[in-house]
């Protein structure tokens, strides 16, 4: 939803809610971990109240542990934290699960997938950033394909069940290859909301 029209957020949320999209992906930015500032809890609570979709909340913030219970209270279904922001990742993952949410971990483009090897079996989702986090509308980083393949091999090796999510620069040109490499979830922001017919664009992605 970062690429939505914030002046018409209800309209854009309703469009997604009535589309073939499976989830609503919400980027929470604090201006510290990433340069930008985005949605706060009151906005997310309002979105959840008026949406039937799974709420996939991506925390691009420092000290995410401080807010885990609050994000449960406002309706988050999936809560993803950055490995780069967590001093005690294993503890953070289990704190999320203790609140009955799905637990995800995000990796910045420069972060190796091997950095989360020891927690893979605890995860419901791994989000690979395919752009540098903090701003929408960036170009896709080509090395992401290799990281998806590496992560899929690790998933098979460890008999883990997490979903592989790709966030950033996703479009109809790179989506087929991402899926063939092993991606399960594609986050499309600018490609959807900047298109002439966002609902059809979502349908086109879902048809792949």
Please state what every model-predicted region is.
Residues 84-86, 108-110, 131-135, 190-193:
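Short, acidic/turn-prone active-site loops that include or flank metal/cofactor-
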Residues 7, 106-110, 168:
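Short gly/ser/thr-rich secondary-structure transition/capping motifs
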Residues 25, 165-166:
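Generic enzyme active-site microenvironment
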Residues 166-169, 187-191:
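Glycine-rich beta-strand-to-loop/alpha-helix junction loops that act as flexible
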Residues 76-84, 179-188:
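Short, electropositive alpha-helical surface patch
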Residues 169-181:
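Acidic, divalent-metal-coordinating active-site segment for phosphoryl/phosphodiester hydrolysis
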Residues 1-80, 85-88, 95-98, 102-103, ...:
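Conserved N-terminal beta1-alpha1 strand-loop-helix module at the mouth
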């Amino acid at each position: 939803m970062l690429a939505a029209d914030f002046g018409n957020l209800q309209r854009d949320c309703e469009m997604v809610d009535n589309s073939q999209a499976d989830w609503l992906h919400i980027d929470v930015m604090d201006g510290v971990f990433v340069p930008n500032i985005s949605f706060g809890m009151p906005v997310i609570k309002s979105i959840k109240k008026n949406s039937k979709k799974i709420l996939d909340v991506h925390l691009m913030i420092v000290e995410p542990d401080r807010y885990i219970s609050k994000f449960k209270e406002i309706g988050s279904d999936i809560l993803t934290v950055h490995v780069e922001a967590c001093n005690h990742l294993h503890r953070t993952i289990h704190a999320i699960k203790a609140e009955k949410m799905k637990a995800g971990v995000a990796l910045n483009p420069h972060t190796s997938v091997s950095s989360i090897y020891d927690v893979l079996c605890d995860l419901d989702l791994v989000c690979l950033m395919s752009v540098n986090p903090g701003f929408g509308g960036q170009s896709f980083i080509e090395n992401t394909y290799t990281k998806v393949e590496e992560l899929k091999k690790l998933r098979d090796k460890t008999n883990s069940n997490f979903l592989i999510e790709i966030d950033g620069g996703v479009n109809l040109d790179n989506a087929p290859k991402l899926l063939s490499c092993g991606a399960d979830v594609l986050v499309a922001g600018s490609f959807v909301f900047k298109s002439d017919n966002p609902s059809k664009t979502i349908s086109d992605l879902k048809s792949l």
